[in-house]
């Protein structure tokens, strides 16, 4: 067998060094956490269950909004940030608000609320997996109802904001506060407010990044899919957007935990360095 060339050995050595450096870096730890957490799998579950359980409830709630009578389709179009043409396709996908109210019974509304609580449980489980916490006890299920009510209020507030820079500022602050509080509530206060703040900030930034991405990608995709596949094409794009929302919600929490741990490592390193300097060590 021929001996390997020095250049080949150096390349393998450099590759091993880069692999080891990445493995020990914050990015490497984040990659491993995301793989162990099965981030994409949970985002797909978030989108599927959200579309089946939460969206029907929001359709009825939006139809009953006395201020904004455009219904849930208008909410969704605003969230997607789509163009006027794509907005029409989204509006055509759902029944008019008045029809939604006329065909909804008290039993149907109670069933929709129960389904919405199931979705809240999925979000709570995701946050618990991010922080490697045991499942919450059954008597804390009231938190799901509180979270669902505040979620609806948050969406109502977002739909009533007027255009302009003020809307962007208020929406960003409201998003960060909502997800900061959501983690604290659904985790049952087992993680401190300070540790949860980076995750809320990462989620807020990620959702606004998703909005920009939606305007650039999903908006023309809705128009082309509607022509090619009809309403089914629009549904597929909306589902893809919900996958992105789930990815950002859980991914933001993962990034937040990683940032918090890196901050703690930095604080520990600085304290050790100060102690060494005071003791006259190297």
What are these regions (language model features)?
Residues 1-282:
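Membrane-embedded alpha-helices and immediately adjacent juxtamembrane helical segments
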């Amino acid at each position: 067998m021929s001996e390997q060339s020095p250049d080949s050995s150096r390349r393998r050595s450099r590759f091993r060094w880069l692999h080891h450096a990445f493995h020990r870096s914050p990015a490497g730890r984040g990659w491993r956490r995301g793989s162990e957490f099965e981030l994409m799998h949970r985002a797909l579950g978030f989108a599927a269950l959200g579309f089946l359980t939460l969206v029907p409830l929001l359709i009825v709630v939006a139809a009953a909004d006395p201020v904004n009578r455009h219904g849930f389709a208008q909410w969704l179009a605003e969230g997607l940030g789509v163009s006027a043409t794509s907005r029409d396709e989204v509006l055509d996908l759902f029944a008019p608000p008045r029809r939604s109210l006329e065909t909804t019974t008290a039993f149907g509304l109670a069933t929709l609320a129960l389904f919405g609580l199931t979705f809240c449980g999925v979000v709570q489980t995701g946050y618990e997996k991010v922080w490697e916490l045991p499942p919450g006890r059954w008597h804390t299920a009231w938190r799901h109802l509180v979270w669902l009510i505040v979620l609806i209020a948050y969406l109502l507030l977002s739909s009533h904001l007027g255009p302009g820079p003020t809307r962007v500022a208020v929406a960003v602050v409201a998003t960060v506060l909502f997800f900061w509080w959501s983690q604290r509530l659904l985790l049952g206060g087992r993680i401190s407010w300070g540790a949860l703040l980076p995750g809320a900030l990462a989620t807020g930034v990620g959702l606004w990044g998703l909005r920009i991405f939606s305007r650039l990608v999903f908006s023309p995709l809705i128009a082309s899919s509607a022509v090619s596949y009809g309403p089914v094409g629009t549904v597929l794009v909306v589902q893809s957007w919900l996958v992105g929302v789930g990815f950002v919600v859980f991914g933001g929490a993962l990034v937040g935990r990683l940032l918090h741990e890196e901050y703690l490592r930095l604080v520990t390193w600085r304290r050790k360095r100060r102690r060494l300097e005071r003791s006259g060590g190297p």
